[in-house]
Amino acid sequence: MDAEAMQAIYAPYVERTAITFEVEAPSVEEFRRRIRHTQEKYPWLVAERNGEVLGYAYLGEFKSRPAYAHSAETSIYVRMDAHGMGIGRALYVSLEEKAQAMGLLNLNACIAYTETADDYLTDASVRFHERMGYVRCAHFHQCARKFGHWYDMIWMEMLFERR
């Protein structure tokens, strides 16, 4: 996996947006470590076009207690100049297929949120998840501060049919 290309996609989200509440972009080596750690248990998918990495999505542990074993958290990042090309949708469709094959029943997305869009955050991620069939299930108010602004966090979930 091209950790360098994926870190280059992620870093601008950290440095210029409130989409992630991480405040310092990880090094390429740290990013590589995160990929390896995730892949021990969960899928990490990469979207490429003509050999160029355009985005990635992965599942992660929702909670560490065994009772949560049928749930996972989703994450997705698409290169900023590649939005609107269907990359996010394709990644999520594949991710959901892999989740179901793993026997997962719930996918949860933790999303930065603001009532009023600003230079650092819009509702694009919420709208994307709604289009993908996720529904809002929790809202935490003013729980994160970045770039001198308070931001909310919402959780959205996708529930697969119970087996």
Outline where the language-model segments fall.
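Conserved GNAT acetyl-CoA-binding A-motif
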Residues: 99-121
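Acetyl-CoA-dependent GNAT
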Residues: 23-81, 92-93, 98, 102, ...
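Glycine-rich phosphate-binding loop
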Residues: 86
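Conserved catalytic-core motifs of GNAT/GCN5-like acyltransferases
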Residues: 58-61, 110-112, 126, 130-149
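C-terminal "cap" of GNAT-fold acetyltransferases
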Residues: 122, 142-163
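A short, internal acetyl-CoA/4′-phosphopantetheine-binding micro-motif in the GNAT/acyltransferase core
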Residues: 75-83, 111-116
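A short beta-loop-alpha structural element at the N-terminal edge
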Residues: 1-6
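Helix-loop element at the rim of GNAT/NAT acetyltransferase active sites that forms part
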Residues: 8-25, 38
